[in-house]
């Protein structure tokens, strides 16, 4: 039978001390509990892979928001984040699993035990960045999310101990005042080329607006 409920979880207190991989490898496959309150901070891969990232000590800031640009400083910043990060995974390596509800609406849910999804805490179908998870319990696992290059340490919540989200960053009822008029502008920096007319092609010509490769 399944005796997982009889196992006493090993406590983990973040940030990790020592080598992160060594720390987690010594606990791989174990049922663990994080003693810290963790903050929902990253959910870019939620819809694709069914995973979110939680951090001890609050939501992390961009390095240059609190420090001047520095290669060494940024490296240390990433190292510090790796000691505070927890990936909660839905234990389903399928990509872009359909999240449509029976009524045809598409919702984004937070991952829970057994590869499923459930409703969030701020309404019928979502959580927000900044919400909290306390007493996170699950099986520690090293695996990929569903695509190559995504190997990482992950927590798989169990049916007996699903992740519970507490509202800590409620959605404002009305947009906050910005203190004046603003003008929004945008620029496509992903295609901001300085060599658009330079090409190694001998037959297609340059990539200019009137070129054959546009």
Predicted regions and their residues:
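Extended non-catalytic accessory segments flanking core domains
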Residues: 1-213
